[in-house]
Amino acid sequence: MKRKLFWICAVAMGMSAFPSFMTQATPATQPLINAEPAVAAQTEQNPQVGQVMPGVQGADAPVVAQNGPSRDVKLTFAQIAPPPGSMVLRGINPNGSIEFGMRSDEVVTKAMLNLEYTPSPSLLPVQSQLKVYLNDELMGVLPVTKEQLGKKTLAQMPINPLFITDFNRVRLEFVGHYQDVCENPASTTLWLDVGRSSGLDLTYQTLNVKNDLSHFPVPFFDPRDNRTNTLPMVFAGAPDVGLQQASAIVASWFGSRSGWRGQNFPVLYNQLPDRNAIVFATNDKRPDFLRDHPAVKAPVIEMINHPQNPYVKLLVVFGRDDKDLLQAAKGIAQGNILFRGESVVVNEVKPLLPRKPYDAPNWVRTDRPVTFGELKTYEEQLQSSGLEPAAINVSLNLPPDLYLMRSTGIDMDINYRYTMPPVKDSSRMDISLNNQFLQSFNLSSKQEANRLLLRIPVLQGLLDGKTDVSIPALKLGATNQLRFDFEYMNPMPGGSVDNCITFQPVQNHVVIGDDSTIDFSKYYHFIPMPDLRAFANAGFPFSRMADLSQTITVMPKTPNEAQMETLLNTVGFIGAQTGFPAINLTVTDDGSTIQGKDADIMIIGGIPDKLKDDKQIDLLVQATESWVKTPMRQTPFPGIVPDESDRAAETQSTLTSSGAMAAVIGFQSPYNDQRSVIALLADSPRGYEMLNDAVNDSGKRATMFGSVAVIRESGINSLRVGDVYYVGHLPWFERLWYALANHPILLAVLAVLAVLAAISVILLAWVLWRLLRIISRRRLNPDNE
């Protein structure tokens, strides 16, 4: 009886669940992300599998607000694919990919992949094809037809927006065949070239997100957005020194987050921005659009809607005075992990430990060996797979003043694992630094030749090796790329049609251990100055202290928007190099206060009167008039350091022009011989526009070197002119070697003299030793005299 009741209950429950199951199987109405009334999705009949029809979407687009603003974006492979932007897909390396992100306050409503490719004329039609994946979901297949062989082909592939997430990878997989039997996947006839003009057409729609600081820094900076972070800064009017310092802290923090993307901080005085922005306001001095906002009683950070556009957000930094704004800015830079709700009050930001020189988070540590695990920027960076595994790259950002001239090499202890080659052959690991080959190591095919054996069973087995490598130090700069290439001699099928040898190729796996180390702790800090290349590449000398605690910035009394923009862009750029905000930067508008200061000086707008007559200055820009000193001999390349006589100023030329010009100059501080001055000058609004563009553009910064960089409409020209001074410390013997390094004849003479002196010392010691033995013998045996 109990068994019957059990089965009756089971049948009843099954019947009740059946309608629910049927309901879930039908297309469901998509919910609106911004919580507005839902709109039922329009269903379409799915296209036939295998067909690629322009304009046909594989699934319904996400449902979003009808009145939300949208933007159309074209991302070409030249922008988002690995350099040079084009891809050559081959039989043994059939995959290529591009990556793009989607901001958290946007959604993609339409996506189309436009491909321009050329297939090899040797391919078999139809059997050869190009498969397109989005986040490992197959989007479609493009068969290679007879008419396409050897010709440039244009194709469109609709991308299903439902599969687009915060981070996306479009992968192209080439399936190539050139004969029916006995194929060699390494054949040079198996290729398909994808042009760099291929791209993605995306339509983004903005979402009306909630004012919630728990997501900060989103939407003011979104790490999913690969574009330059353009973030306007709004003031009621020309800011005073305290407000300049507060805004510089905020800009440098956003710069530290932007990193390689770049940053730009347009400045507005009492104007509404047209995009997400930062607004600085006090109870007494605020932009007109905040005139009705209640007064505050403490430093407050609040996220509000744009008065005219709810899709645009404003981060308002409020305070009773500039002191409050400074505290709020430090709260953004150091306390943002506690942000939540629409607003927060910054009660206190108390420093606990002072920063030390060269401790910038983005720089490789120079006080101890560093593991490769500390240098990783994403989880799988130190591993690779494939018949020909892709190169493993590690970035090394170093202080520009690291003295490496007499170094015999930098110790690097590498632990690596790799798939064992099936036979002893020429498979190897090549190590390169900045595209310069360093050393090569054979990949052993015998387990006993390696110290460790990985216990996890993998195809063909993984071997473990340990190698010490010495890096030639003179090849290092401020920014370096260390590359590991694993080159395998993969056995390939062969034979004839009647006697064909075939097998399934097996992928190779390579790993550089996280516990591998590199050691820069044994080197001095010493650099000849002025060197604008050190400033352009690493923000040096200001970045020596990551918090800019030993930097003084001299601003005009009443800076205009362009001058404020130069300040914010410069400290933002330095923050991007160091990875740390300028929380202890000093800003002044009185040039007389820098006298006697033990600090590096950044000048924006104009040289203070007391410095204009300094003989170290090699260029000056004042309104329409400018003058410059030119050297005896100019070197065209940044890496070539001229002799002191070649750098000597030969001529000073003064010109007057209505054309725009800007300049960056460097010279020794007259107040401390270990300190430097970097001045960013311009003669007009257009000049400041070119100056800011140069500061924000890494390509233009790369052309800056020497002591003078002149910025004109035609580009940037740099000069090495004037005296050289040295910053840092070397022991006396290293300093002597450095002084003689460029004088080989004198060095040879001194070397000969040193050898003669050594021989003389040895002879003198031998004579003294003989004399002492004679004296000792006579003292002990006076009868033998």
Curated annotation (Swiss-Prot):
<dbReference type="InterPro" id="IPR003920">
    <property type="entry name" value="Cell_synth_B"/>
</dbReference>
<keyword id="KW-1133">Transmembrane helix</keyword>
<comment type="similarity">
    <text>Belongs to the AcsB/BcsB family.</text>
</comment>
<keyword id="KW-1003">Cell membrane</keyword>
<feature type="signal peptide">
    <location>
        <begin position="1"/>
        <end position="25"/>
    </location>
</feature>
<dbReference type="Pfam" id="PF03170">
    <property type="entry name" value="BcsB"/>
</dbReference>
<feature type="topological domain" description="Cytoplasmic">
    <location>
        <begin position="766"/>
        <end position="785"/>
    </location>
</feature>
<feature type="transmembrane region" description="Helical">
    <location>
        <begin position="745"/>
        <end position="765"/>
    </location>
</feature>
<comment type="pathway">
    <text>Glycan metabolism; bacterial cellulose biosynthesis.</text>
</comment>
<keyword id="KW-0472">Membrane</keyword>
<dbReference type="GO" id="GO:0030244">
    <property type="term" value="P:cellulose biosynthetic process"/>
</dbReference>
<keyword id="KW-0812">Transmembrane</keyword>
<keyword id="KW-0135">Cellulose biosynthesis</keyword>
<dbReference type="InterPro" id="IPR018513">
    <property type="entry name" value="Cell_synthase_bac"/>
</dbReference>
<dbReference type="GO" id="GO:0005886">
    <property type="term" value="C:plasma membrane"/>
</dbReference>
<protein>
    <recommendedName>
        <fullName>Cyclic di-GMP-binding protein</fullName>
    </recommendedName>
</protein>
<feature type="topological domain" description="Periplasmic">
    <location>
        <begin position="26"/>
        <end position="744"/>
    </location>
</feature>
<keyword id="KW-0973">c-di-GMP</keyword>
<comment type="subunit">
    <text>Tightly associated with the cellulose synthase catalytic subunit.</text>
</comment>
<dbReference type="GO" id="GO:0006011">
    <property type="term" value="P:UDP-alpha-D-glucose metabolic process"/>
</dbReference>
<comment type="function">
    <text>Binds the cellulose synthase activator, bis-(3'-5') cyclic diguanylic acid (c-di-GMP).</text>
</comment>
<keyword id="KW-0997">Cell inner membrane</keyword>
<keyword id="KW-0732">Signal</keyword>
